[in-house]
């Protein structure tokens, strides 16, 4: 769905402007100067000759899902490096970090119920799980094992079976659309300061014990000779979408615990099977899963490239997005969209020939989906150790890090990560894009992506506020995260905005204001 206001905004986006003028600002810190002539060049290149969708298409449909340390992510990175080099970026390279662990790829997957009536399943294997060593047909059972006593009672009865894990999912009808834009009220709410009114709700007791039982249960199923396990999708997405990530079995261990093939299926299909079994109707499944592990190399990498600066080339502005994805779809909204936008922003800046005083560096991370591993390794090597807060020389030289990882939606503003001092600066840089819907500066911090790796060591790391579109409702980590979910106009506009922010950060007289340095994590645990 592409609202009419976006088409109108894009028609009016390229304006004939020139010169550098400061924007009006309420009394307080002096606003930054905005180079409108540079913005005009950036808009013209980014909206008239964009390559962002071609980049996204290559990442998603030519190379497919880009699981960390898989052959596909390495092939995609080699292609991206060639593209960046062809655009004229300097120092394009893969920087190794790790060790990460084994690579993995699914090479074949079919799952069809063959009795009592045949129907194919919407399903996918969990990453880093084994295959079936060829096609198998087996009865499905629902033992409902919850305790060690249950395991003892079922011992010897599960050999050659396929086991259901978990209860049926309550699938709700859709009374609201899957895709949406932020409303004015929602954006206004983001600008308010969050208040912690109390201690909050404590964590649920028994978590570690449950995790320990689950690990023992999976090993028990493998020992009992179970053919495979089947579990429902999370219930968050439903309606044909399945959310699939990795196995609890570690990818870091070259000799991990033996587990069975693990399959995630659509909630509707899971519920049908569970109801048949509850009605004493036998169910048989034909399954063929071919998964492959790659034990070399065990180290992963980040892809880096630069546009060198001039008189302040030792100072750096960074743009980043995670390059890795999960595997059920092709990693389009999460996060080929962000990677393509950041690559396109670099192309725009290089093609326009604009002069940047500071070096602009692009970093495409891997290991984000496993816990910001690539970006945290880079920050520790280049800037600071988050545990001890021992600073490296590069810490004082980073002007800012800008991250893109909120799907395909249009940029509506910036999360300031609690850095109120940067508000007047960003207000000036945002104003030329107000008519495109970029109006919001939220003091709130947003978590869960690579800007956190910078923010947690006191560096100015920022994430853009983006329209949700279908990100949390349909595409995030699902089999539906494919090229068709991408919104071309939004990605084109986002690349222009990122390029403008990078340009102004690179040419600002001083570095962006920073928050106070956080305490060392080791000190907090004493």
Enumerate the language-model features and the residues they cover.
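Bacterial N-terminal signal peptides
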Residues: 8-20
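Second-shell loop/turn segments in exported
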Residues: 39-47, 61-72, 138-144, 152-153, ...
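N-terminal capping segment at the start of a domain
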Residues: 33-70, 241-242, 324-325, 400-409, ...
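Soluble metallo-hydrolase cores and metallopeptidase-like ectodomains found primarily
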Residues: 37-38, 114-115, 120-153, 249-332, ...
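Metal-dependent peptidase/peptidase-like ectodomains
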Residues: 116-120, 133-138, 156, 160-162, ...
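Noncatalytic luminal/extracellular "stalk/propeptide" segments of secretory-pathway proteins
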Residues: 26-38, 57, 61-198
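Disordered, low-complexity segments in secreted/periplasmic proteins that are enriched in proline
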Residues: 23-30, 197-208, 236, 526
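Active-site-adjacent substrate-binding region
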Residues: 205-210, 215-218, 222-223, 228, ...
């Amino acid at each position: 769905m592409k609202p009419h206001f976006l088409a109108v905004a894009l028609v009016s986006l390229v304006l004939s402007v020139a010169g550098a003028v400061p924007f009006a600002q309420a009394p307080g810190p002096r606003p930054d100067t905005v180079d409108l002539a540079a913005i005009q060049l950036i808009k013209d290149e980014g909206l008239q000759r964009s390559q962002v969708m071609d980049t996204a298409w290559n990442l998603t449909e030519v190379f497919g899902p880009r699981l960390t340390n898989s052959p596909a992510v390495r092939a995609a990175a080699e292609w991206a490096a060639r593209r960046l080099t062809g655009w004229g970026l300097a120092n394009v390279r893969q920087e190794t970090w790790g060790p990460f662990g084994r690579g993995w790829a699914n090479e074949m997957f079919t799952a069809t119920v063959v009795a009592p009536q045949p129907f194919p399943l919407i399903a996918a294997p969990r990453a880093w799980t084994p295959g079936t060593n060829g096609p198998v047909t087996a009865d499905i059972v629902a033992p409902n094992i919850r305790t060690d006593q249950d395991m003892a009672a079922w011992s010897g009865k599960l050999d050659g079976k396929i086991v259901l894990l978990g209860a049926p999912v309550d699938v709700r009808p859709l009374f609201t659309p899957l895709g949406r834009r932020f409303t004015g009220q929602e954006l206004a709410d983001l600008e308010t300061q969050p208040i912690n009114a109390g201690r909050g709700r404590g964590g649920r007791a028994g978590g570690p014990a449950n995790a320990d039982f689950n690990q023992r249960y999976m090993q028990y199923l493998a020992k009992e000779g179970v053919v495979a396990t089947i579990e429902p999708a999370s219930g968050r997405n439903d309606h044909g979408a399945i959310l699939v990530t990795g196995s609890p079995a570690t990818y870091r261990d070259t000799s991990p615990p033996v587990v069975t093939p693990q399959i995630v299926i659509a909630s509707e299909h899971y519920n049908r099977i569970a109801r048949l079994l509850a009605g004493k109707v036998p169910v048989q499944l034909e399954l063929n899963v071919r998964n492959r592990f790659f034990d070399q190399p065990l180290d992963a990498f980040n892809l880096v490239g630069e546009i060198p600066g001039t008189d302040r080339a030792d100072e750096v502005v960074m743009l980043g997005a995670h390059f890795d994805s999960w595997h059920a779809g092709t990693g389009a909204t999460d996060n080929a969209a962000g990677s393509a936008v950041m690559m396109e922003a670099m192309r725009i800046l290089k093609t326009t020939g604009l002069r940047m005083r500071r070096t602009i560096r692009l970093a495409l991370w891997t290991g984000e989906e496993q816990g910001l591993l690539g970006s945290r390794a880079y920050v520790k090597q280049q800037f600071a150790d988050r545990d001890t807060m021992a600073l490296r020389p590069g810490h004082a030289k980073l002007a800012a890090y800008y991250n893109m990882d909120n799907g395909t939606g249009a940029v509506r503003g910036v999360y300031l990560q609690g850095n109120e001092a940067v508000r007047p600066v960003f207000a000036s840089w945002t104003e030329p894009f107000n008519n495109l819907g970029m109006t919001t500066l939220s003091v709130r911090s947003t978590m869960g992506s690579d800007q956190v790796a910078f923010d947690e060591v006191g560096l100015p790391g920022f994430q853009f506020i983006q329209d949700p579109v279908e990100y949390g409702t349909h595409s995030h980590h699902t089999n539906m995260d494919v090229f068709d979910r991408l919104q071309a106009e939004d990605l084109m506009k986002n690349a222009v905005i990122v390029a403008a922010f990078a340009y102004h950060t690179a040419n600002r007289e001083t570095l962006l204001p920073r928050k106070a340095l956080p305490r060392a994590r080791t000190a907090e645990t004493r």
